[in-house]
């Protein structure tokens, strides 16, 4: 659900309070935090905070006992530099999504579909971009027999796909592909204490 409002209207605090409440109840929470504003729930507050007195007063007014506590978090990071890496296998991404990502033409997309079909039928793992590059090289070297089996596979299209993969690798995307692959359950789990 989206939260809209101007600066200082309490959007971040509202999300933090909701996440803390769900976590305390044992309900896993996933939140996108591009700016890092929500990351504060990973560390317990302290009596040294400039607003501690105001917090204590407010808690007493509404009949609560103020207790600072940290909540379990996992910071996910596409490149694995400042958090837990997010990975997917090439096979899990599939030819359609990968074709869109690479901005392939229709004939090139057809060749990529042939590559995925061949990998599936021959039980070849497509875990990372190196696996896909190796498969495309094999297809280019055996284009006549593969064309007879699946339809025309041009070496020009194979070369174009390989160049697009090179661009993707140069942008650091190779780190995203591989194992262990991210599963939905990885995003929605509790810690050892059920929070």
Show where each model-derived region lies.
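The conserved Walker
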Residues: 6-7
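Hydrophobic anchor at the beta1->P-loop junction of P-loop NTPases
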Residues: 3
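Conserved lysine of the Walker
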Residues: 11
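P-loop NTPase motor domains
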Residues: 19-28, 36-50, 54-195
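Hydrophobic positions on the alpha1 helix immediately C-terminal to the Walker A/P-loop
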Residues: 14, 18
